[in-house]
C-alpha cells in the first residue's frame, strides 16, 4: 500500500505534469466538441425555424369566419382541391390555402404594387418605390374595389378574410422563413392584414409585365436623337427611314395573323346578363356582331420589372386550339403556355375550386392556375369550357413630351395647372422620404425617375411624332422659357373591370358567356382562346384598346397638341372574333391579330410571327398524317425550332 504522511517539514509528493502534446490534444478535443455542439444546436435551430413555418395540411382546423365545413384535399404534389357549400366559404378557404403556401410572396407582391418595398428592405429600394408610387397602381386598385358590384366584392372580401384567418394564428417566422431573415435588419416589421385592394393591385403588376411596346418607343426616341447627332432638331427623313429599317413592319405576306377573317358569332350574339350569376347587371355589353425586345431601357424600369417578374428578352407566349374534326377524340384540344417571368416560387398557383352543389348561388366548379394573392382561377377550365391567354401585344402605352412652365404645362396654346400630390415613402432603418408626383391630362410625369425618359426630356425633338406632310405638332413649340418633361399614358392607370372578369370566365357555359366575360377583361389585354364540350372553338380580342387622333404612338407625341390625344377605345363589338373557323384551328403567339386593312390601328410592334408560323406548320403537318392527340399538343409545346433564322 502506497501512502503518504505529513511530516514536520510539510512536504508532499508532486504529480508529474502532462506533456505539451497531451495538453494540445485535450484543447483540440474541447474545441472540436464545442464546434460540434454549436453545429448541432445551429442545425436544430435552423430546422426548427424552417419547419415551424410549414402549414398544417392534414387533419382538421377550427376557423372563425366559415359558415360550414370546407374540405381541402391535396394530391401527391400538394395541389389543393377546395370544396365548399358557399362561395364565401370557397374563397375564404382559397385565401387561407394561398397564405399557407405563399404568404411571403403575397406580402412582397403587395409591397411592390403599392411602392412600399423600402419598408421591407431599406433605402436601396426607395428609387423603385418612387417610380411605382408615381404610376399609382395601388390607388387604381382601390378605385376598382370601390366600383365593384356587391357579388364580386364579396368574393374579394371572403378571400381577404381567409388570408387574415391564417395571419391570426401565426406571426414572424411562423408565417415564413423569410420573416426571420427580415427581422435581422428590420426587427419592427410586421405584416398588415390583407385587403381586397392588395389582390386587385397584382393585376396592375401583371399589366406592367405585359405592357407592350413602351421600351421600343423609348428606344426609338433615343436612337433618333443619337442618329441625328444634334440637339433641338427634328429627326431628318434619313433618320426616320433608318428607324423603319431597324423596326420593320410585320411580314403579313409571310407569317400568319390570328384572325384571317372575322367570323360570325352564334345566332343571338352576346348577352351580357347570360354570362353568369357573378356578373353585375350594368356591364354595358351590347350584342356583338361580325362587324368589324430590346433589353430593359432604364435601371428603375428594370428594377420594377424584376420585382414583378418580367417576361425577359426574346420570350413569348403561345396558345392554340384545334377543333374536333382534327382531333383523334373528336373533341377540341386547347394548349396554352403563357411565358410570364421565371420566379421561385412560380407566379402561378394550381388549384381546383368546387361548390358542393353547383347552382346559381354557388356556380363554381373550375380548375386551373391562379395567382397567389388573387381569388379565383385565371386560366383553366370548368365542366363546359376551357380558355387560355397570350399577350395581345397591342399598343396601349404612349409617351407624351410635355412643355412645363413652373407649375403649369402648355395645352393648345394655353397654360394649364399641373396636378400634384405628395406621398411619403417609409424606409426601414432610415428617414421618411417625401415624394411629389406631378401629372398632366395624359398621365404621370416619369422623366426624372428613369434615365431614359429623362434623356428624352433633355432632347425630345428628334424622337417626336410629327405628321410628315404638315409637320403638325412640332412647327410651333410653345413657351420658349419652358422645360420639357415626359408623361405616360397607359390603359392600366384607369380603373377597369378585369378583377370581375376572372369569375365570369370561371362560370361561363358557352361562347356567348365567354365573350361577355371577355368584354370585362380590359387590362391587361390578352388574346383569349376557347373550346367547349359541345365541340366549338373560338377566339376573342378583348381589352381597352385606344383610338388615337393624330399619330400612332410609335414615337413620343407632342403633349401640347390635343390632336394627338386618345379619343376613345375600340368598341368591343368591333374587336376581332373567330368562331369555328374553316381551318379547324386558331393559333396565337403574340403575332398580328388581323391584316393591316383592319378599321382600327392596333400596333406596329407585334412579335414577327415566326413562332405562330411554326405552330401552324406543325398542326397542319401532323393533321395531314393522323388526327391530333394530347401528346401531339405537348410535343408542339416542347418544340424548339426557331424559324426566324430559316425563313
Where are these regions (language model features)?
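Hydrophobic alpha-helical segments
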Residues: 447, 451, 520-622
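N-terminal Sec-pathway targeting helices
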Residues: 18-38
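N-terminal Lys/Arg-rich, disordered targeting/topogenic segments
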Residues: 2-24
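Second-shell loop/turn segments in exported
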Residues: 90-93, 130-131, 139-153, 489, ...
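Short active-site loop/helix that positions an aromatic residue
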Residues: 339-356, 508-522
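Substrate-recognition/specificity elements adjacent to catalytic centers across diverse enzyme folds
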Residues: 7-8, 30, 43-333, 338, ...
Amino acid at each position: 500500500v502506497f501512502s503518504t504522511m505529513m511530516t514536520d517539514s510539510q512536504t508532499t509528493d508532486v504529480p508529474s505534469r502532462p506533456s505539451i502534446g497531451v495538453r494540445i490534444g485535450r484543447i483540440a478535443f474541447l474545441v472540436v466538441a464545442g464546434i460540434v455542439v454549436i453545429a448541432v444546436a445551429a442545425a436544430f435551430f435552423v430546422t426548427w425555424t424552417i419547419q415551424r413555418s410549414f402549414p398544417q395540411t392534414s387533419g382538421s382546423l377550427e376557423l372563425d369566419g366559415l359558415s360550414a365545413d370546407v374540405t381541402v384535399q391535396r394530391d401527391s404534389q400538394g395541389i389543393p382541391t377546395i370544396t365548399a357549400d358557399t362561395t364565401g366559404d370557397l374563397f375564404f378557404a382559397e385565401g387561407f390555402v394561398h397564405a399557407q403556401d405563399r404568404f411571403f410572396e403575397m406580402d412582397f407582391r403587395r409591397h411592390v404594387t403599392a411602392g412600399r418595398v423600402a419598408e421591407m428592405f431599406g433605402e436601396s429600394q426607395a428609387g423603385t418605390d418612387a417610380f411605382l408610387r408615381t404610376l399609382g397602381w395601388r390607388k387604381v386598385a382601390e378605385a376598382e374595389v370601390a366600383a365593384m358590384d356587391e357579388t364580386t366584392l364579396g368574393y374579394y372580401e371572403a378571400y381577404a378574410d381567409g388570408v387574415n384567418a391564417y395571419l391570426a394564428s401565426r406571426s414572424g417566422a411562423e408565417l415564413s422563413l423569410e420573416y426571420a431573415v427580415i427581422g435581422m435588419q428590420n426587427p419592427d416589421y410586421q405584416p398588415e392584414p390583407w385587403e381586397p385592394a392588395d389582390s386587385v393591385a397584382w393585376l396592375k403588376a401583371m399589366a406592367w409585365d405585359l405592357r407592350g411596346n413602351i421600351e421600343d418607343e423609348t428606344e426609338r426616341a433615343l436612337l433618333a436623337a443619337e442618329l441625328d447627332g444634334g440637339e433641338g432638331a427634328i429627326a431628318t427623313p434619313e433618320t426616320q427611314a433608318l428607324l423603319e429599317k431597324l423596326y420593320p413592319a410585320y411580314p403579313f405576306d409571310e407569317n400568319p395573323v390570328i384572325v384571317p377573317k372575322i367570323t360570325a358569332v352564334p345566332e343571338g350574339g352576346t348577352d351580357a346578363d347570360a354570362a353568369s350569376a357573378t356578373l353585375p347587371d350594368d356591364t354595358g355589353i351590347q350584342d356583338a356582331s361580325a362587324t368589324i425586345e430590346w433589353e430593359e431601357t432604364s435601371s428603375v424600369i428594370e428594377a420594377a420589372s424584376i420585382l414583378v417578374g418580367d417576361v425577359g428578352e426574346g420570350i413569348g407566349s403561345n396558345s392554340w386550339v384545334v377543333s374536333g374534326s382534327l382531333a383523334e377524340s373528336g373533341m377540341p384540344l386547347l394548349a396554352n403556355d403563357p411565358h410570364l417571368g421565371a420566379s421561385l416560387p412560380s407566379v402561378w398557383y394550381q388549384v381546383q375550386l368546387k361548390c358542393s352543389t353547383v347552382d346559381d348561388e354557388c356556380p363554381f366548379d373550375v380548375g386551373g392556375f391562379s395567382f397567389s394573392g388573387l381569388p379565383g382561377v385565371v386560366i383553366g377550365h370548368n365542366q363546359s369550357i376551357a380558355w387560355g391567354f397570350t399577350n395581345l401585344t397591342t399598343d396601349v402605352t404612349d409617351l407624351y413630351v410635355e412643355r412645363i412652365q413652373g407649375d403649369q404645362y402648355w395645352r393648345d396654346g394655353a397654360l394649364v395647372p399641373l396636378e400634384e400630390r405628395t406621398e411619403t415613402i417609409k424606409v426601414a432603418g432610415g428617414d421618411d422620404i417625401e415624394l411629389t408626383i406631378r401629372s398632366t391630362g395624359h398621365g404621370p410625369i416619369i422623366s426624372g425617375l428613369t434615365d431614359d425618359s429623362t434623356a428624352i426630356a433633355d432632347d425630345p425633338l428628334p424622337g417626336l411624332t410629327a405628321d410628315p406632310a404638315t409637320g403638325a405638332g412640332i412647327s410651333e413649340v410653345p413657351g420658349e422659357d419652358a422645360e420639357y418633361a415626359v408623361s405616360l399614358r397607359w390603359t392600366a392607370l384607369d380603373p377597369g373591370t378585369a378583377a370581375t372578369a376572372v369569375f365570369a370566365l370561371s362560370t361561363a357555359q358557352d361562347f356567348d358567356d365567354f365573350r361577355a366575360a371577355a368584354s370585362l377583361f380590359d387590362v391587361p389585354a390578352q388574346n383569349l382562346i376557347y373550346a367547349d364540350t359541345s365541340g366549338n372553338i373560338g377566339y376573342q380580342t378583348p381589352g381597352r384598346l385606344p383610338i388615337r387622333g393624330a399619330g400612332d404612338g410609335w414615337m413620343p407625341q407632342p403633349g401640347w397638341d390635343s390632336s394627338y390625344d386618345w379619343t376613345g377605345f375600340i368598341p368591343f363589338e368591333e374587336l376581332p372574333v373567330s368562331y369555328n373557323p374553316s381551318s379547324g384551328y386558331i393559333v396565337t403567339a403574340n403575332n398580328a391579330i388581323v391584316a393591316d386593312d383592319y378599321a382600327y390601328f392596333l400596333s406596329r410592334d407585334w412579335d414577327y410571327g415566326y413562332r405562330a408560323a411554326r405552330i401552324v406548320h406543325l398542326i397542319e403537318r401532323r393533321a395531314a398524317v393522323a388526327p391530333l392527340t394530347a401528346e401531339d399538343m405537348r410535343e408542339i409545346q416542347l418544340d424548339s425550332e426557331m424559324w426566324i433564322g430559316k425563313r
